[in-house]
Amino acid sequence: MTHSPSFLQHALSSSDTRAEWPLPGGLAARWLAPGCVELNGDARGADSVLLSCGVHGNETAPIEVVDGMLTDIAAGQLALNCRLLVMFANLDAIRQGVRYGNYDMNRLFNGAHARHPELPESVRAAELETLAAEFFAGARARKLHYDLHTAIRGSVFEKFAIYPFLHDGRTHKREQLAWLQRCGIEAVLLHTQPANTFSYFTSQYCEADAFTLELGKARPFGQNDLSRFSGIDGALRGLLSNPQANVPDLDEDKLPLFRAKYDLVKHSEAFKLNLADSVENFTLLPDGMLIAEDGAVRYQATGGEERILFPNPAVKPGLRAGIVVEPARLPSR
């Protein structure tokens, strides 16, 4: 192939899942599965970077940003000096322009797909786990995973990150938080328990520095103002072309950190969330407010510094209908 290929178009339309495309500078793009393409730059001792997008099919801006980077790599306009794996994750949902078809894929990682083997999303989540594990098994330096999203609602902090729960004495890395700050990330949630998300899987089982990045509001293809994504676009391009570049130190006073305090679990269809449908992520919860109720179960705000994250009373019983978070600090060095 001599012209610059469209990676996204190939991912969405082609049944050729084992194609290999020669690229400028001796690079090659190798399709490992539908929507999953690996590009090896100067791989000697290089970082291994996984960029995933489209886990929710209607979150299109990250898809456009990543496809733009791939297009520039293919045209020889962006140098690649790391191992790169890109996943356009939920192809069916991307084609349909919906968040998901049958089940939220970002609740099916960490082996949760085994509980719903009949679902197409489960089959895909298992495939993505396998490919990610194989990719990171070949890593010789840093293992980095950024799972790119946009949110279904507005947010007090437009761009924020979720740092998955860390086991076995692992600590939050200031240099990664500093890099996120450089991207334009305005707040970070330090998760306090395991989750069935893609970034938790790669963090725990691949020992990657992994993050879920929420980068703005979900909009259809063609309706995104990509200038609002210039921070993450520029930072990722810098990472791919010059992964060893110095990053300014973390300014903790300018990057609010939060920890998950507890989940709002929807136990039954009687669950009632006492927040407006339009409530934004990270909205402050007044002290004493009855946040939600579900029969005899009551969730009440305390202290006046708690905030709501990902409120969604429409989830199925047994699932999380929101997270209550509170301010956090990193341990002293």
Curated annotation (Swiss-Prot):
EC number: 3.5.1.96
Molecular function (Gene Ontology), one example: hydrolase activity, acting on ester bonds
Active-site residues annotated for this sequence: E214
Cross-referenced Gene3D superfamilies: Zn peptidases (3.40.630.10)
Swiss-Prot/TrEMBL catalytic activity: N-succinyl-L-glutamate + H2O = L-glutamate + succinate
Binding residues annotated for Zn(2+), in chain numbering: H56, E59, H149
Recorded family membership: Belongs to the AspA/AstE family. Succinylglutamate desuccinylase subfamily.
Function: Transforms N(2)-succinylglutamate into succinate and glutamate.
UniProt name for this protein: Succinylglutamate desuccinylase
